[in-house]
Amino acid sequence: GFNFLDVGGENYDKNMSGRFYELADEMRLVHEHLPRAFLAAVLFLPLPASRDKGKRSSFAHMVVELRERTNPADPSLPRVPGKCDMGWVALYAEGDEPEGFPRGVVRFFNAARDCPRSGRPKVLETESLSEMAAAIVEAARRQIKPNYVAS
Protein backbone atom coordinates (compact mmCIF):
# COMPACT_ATOMS: atom_id res chain seq x y z
CA GLY A 1 0.00 0.00 0.00
CA PHE A 2 1.02 3.59 -0.63
CA ASN A 3 -0.02 6.76 1.18
CA PHE A 4 0.37 10.24 -0.21
CA LEU A 5 0.24 13.77 1.16
CA ASP A 6 -3.35 14.76 1.93
CA VAL A 7 -5.14 17.50 0.00
CA GLY A 8 -4.36 20.09 2.68
CA GLY A 9 -0.68 19.14 2.42
CA GLU A 10 -0.25 18.55 6.14
CA ASN A 11 0.36 14.83 6.61
CA TYR A 12 0.55 11.42 4.98
CA ASP A 13 -1.89 9.44 7.12
CA LYS A 14 -5.18 10.94 5.87
CA ASN A 15 -6.62 7.69 4.45
CA MET A 16 -4.71 5.24 6.62
CA SER A 17 -7.91 3.64 7.94
CA GLY A 18 -8.96 2.77 4.40
CA ARG A 19 -5.60 1.13 3.71
CA PHE A 20 -5.91 -0.98 6.85
CA TYR A 21 -9.48 -2.08 6.06
CA GLU A 22 -8.22 -3.22 2.65
CA LEU A 23 -5.26 -4.99 4.29
CA ALA A 24 -7.52 -6.82 6.76
CA ASP A 25 -9.84 -7.94 3.95
CA GLU A 26 -6.91 -9.26 1.90
CA MET A 27 -5.41 -11.08 4.89
CA ARG A 28 -8.76 -12.61 5.85
CA LEU A 29 -9.43 -13.78 2.28
CA VAL A 30 -6.00 -15.39 1.85
CA HIS A 31 -6.06 -17.01 5.30
CA GLU A 32 -9.55 -18.36 4.58
CA HIS A 33 -8.30 -20.23 1.50
CA LEU A 34 -4.72 -20.86 2.66
CA PRO A 35 -4.83 -21.03 6.47
CA ARG A 36 -1.10 -21.76 6.84
CA ALA A 37 0.01 -18.96 4.52
CA PHE A 38 2.56 -16.52 5.95
CA LEU A 39 1.64 -12.98 4.94
CA ALA A 40 3.83 -9.91 5.21
CA ALA A 41 2.50 -6.39 4.67
CA VAL A 42 4.68 -3.61 3.28
CA LEU A 43 3.31 -0.06 3.32
CA PHE A 44 5.21 2.71 1.53
CA LEU A 45 5.57 6.31 2.68
CA PRO A 46 7.80 9.08 1.34
CA LEU A 47 10.62 10.17 3.65
CA PRO A 48 8.92 13.49 4.61
CA ALA A 49 6.23 11.40 6.37
CA SER A 50 8.79 10.85 9.15
CA ARG A 51 8.79 14.55 10.03
CA ASP A 52 5.39 15.88 8.92
CA LYS A 53 3.86 16.48 12.36
CA GLY A 54 5.15 17.65 15.71
CA LYS A 55 4.02 15.04 18.23
CA ARG A 56 3.83 11.86 16.17
CA SER A 57 4.75 11.67 12.51
CA SER A 58 2.68 9.85 9.91
CA PHE A 59 5.51 7.28 9.76
CA ALA A 60 5.33 6.62 13.53
CA HIS A 61 1.52 6.45 13.33
CA MET A 62 1.75 3.93 10.47
CA VAL A 63 4.25 1.75 12.38
CA VAL A 64 2.06 1.65 15.50
CA GLU A 65 -1.13 0.93 13.54
CA LEU A 66 0.54 -1.80 11.47
CA ARG A 67 2.01 -3.40 14.60
CA GLU A 68 -1.51 -3.64 16.06
CA ARG A 69 -2.62 -5.44 12.89
CA THR A 70 0.18 -8.00 12.98
CA ASN A 71 -0.05 -11.45 14.54
CA PRO A 72 2.37 -12.19 17.40
CA ALA A 73 5.69 -13.70 16.29
CA ASP A 74 5.29 -16.60 18.77
CA PRO A 75 4.14 -19.64 16.72
CA SER A 76 2.45 -21.18 19.78
CA LEU A 77 -0.09 -18.32 19.91
CA PRO A 78 -3.22 -18.44 17.72
CA ARG A 79 -3.19 -16.43 14.51
CA VAL A 80 -5.96 -13.96 13.71
CA PRO A 81 -7.11 -14.34 10.08
CA GLY A 82 -7.50 -10.58 9.49
CA LYS A 83 -3.95 -9.80 10.57
CA CYS A 84 -0.67 -10.12 8.72
CA ASP A 85 2.18 -12.19 10.11
CA MET A 86 4.81 -9.51 9.68
CA GLY A 87 4.59 -5.80 8.91
CA TRP A 88 7.04 -3.36 7.36
CA VAL A 89 6.89 0.35 6.61
CA ALA A 90 9.06 1.42 3.70
CA LEU A 91 10.42 4.96 3.59
CA TYR A 92 11.43 6.10 0.13
CA ALA A 93 13.27 9.19 -1.10
CA GLU A 94 11.56 11.40 -3.63
CA GLY A 95 14.87 13.11 -4.42
CA ASP A 96 14.15 16.56 -3.00
CA GLU A 97 14.74 15.86 0.71
CA PRO A 98 17.12 18.12 2.63
CA GLU A 99 19.25 15.06 3.50
CA GLY A 100 20.15 14.75 -0.18
CA PHE A 101 19.15 11.10 -0.69
CA PRO A 102 18.87 10.17 -4.37
CA ARG A 103 15.38 9.60 -5.77
CA GLY A 104 14.20 6.02 -5.34
CA VAL A 105 16.27 5.04 -2.30
CA VAL A 106 14.11 2.81 -0.07
CA ARG A 107 14.70 1.48 3.43
CA PHE A 108 12.35 -0.91 5.25
CA PHE A 109 11.41 -0.61 8.93
CA ASN A 110 10.07 -3.63 10.83
CA ALA A 111 6.81 -2.58 12.50
CA ALA A 112 7.55 -4.90 15.43
CA ARG A 113 10.28 -2.46 16.52
CA ASP A 114 9.88 0.85 18.30
CA CYS A 115 10.42 3.87 16.10
CA PRO A 116 11.04 7.55 16.77
CA ARG A 117 7.84 9.54 17.37
CA SER A 118 9.11 12.15 14.94
CA GLY A 119 12.02 12.04 12.53
CA ARG A 120 13.37 9.21 10.46
CA PRO A 121 14.85 6.07 11.99
CA LYS A 122 18.60 5.58 11.83
CA VAL A 123 19.77 3.70 8.75
CA LEU A 124 21.08 0.89 11.01
CA GLU A 125 17.52 0.45 12.37
CA THR A 126 16.21 -0.22 8.85
CA GLU A 127 16.74 -2.98 6.30
CA SER A 128 17.51 -3.16 2.60
CA LEU A 129 15.11 -5.04 0.33
CA SER A 130 17.25 -8.19 0.47
CA GLU A 131 17.58 -7.96 4.27
CA MET A 132 13.82 -7.54 4.63
CA ALA A 133 13.18 -10.50 2.32
CA ALA A 134 15.59 -12.66 4.34
CA ALA A 135 13.85 -11.64 7.59
CA ILE A 136 10.45 -12.52 6.13
CA VAL A 137 11.67 -15.93 4.93
CA GLU A 138 13.23 -16.68 8.33
CA ALA A 139 10.08 -15.64 10.20
CA ALA A 140 7.96 -17.77 7.86
CA ARG A 141 10.21 -20.79 8.49
CA ARG A 142 9.86 -20.32 12.26
CA GLN A 143 6.08 -19.95 11.95
CA ILE A 144 5.53 -22.93 9.67
CA LYS A 145 8.11 -25.41 11.03
CA PRO A 146 6.46 -26.13 14.43
CA ASN A 147 3.10 -26.66 12.71
CA TYR A 148 4.33 -28.78 9.80
CA VAL A 149 3.29 -32.43 9.82
CA ALA A 150 4.84 -34.70 7.20
CA SER A 151 2.39 -37.06 5.53
Which residues does each predicted region cover?
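Acidic, metal/cofactor-coordinating or nucleic-acid-engaging core segments within structured domains
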Residues: 9-92
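Generic low-polarity alpha-helical segments
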Residues: 1-2, 39, 129, 144
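Short acidic/His/Gly/Ser-rich catalytic and metal-binding motifs that mark active-site loops
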Residues: 6-9, 99-101
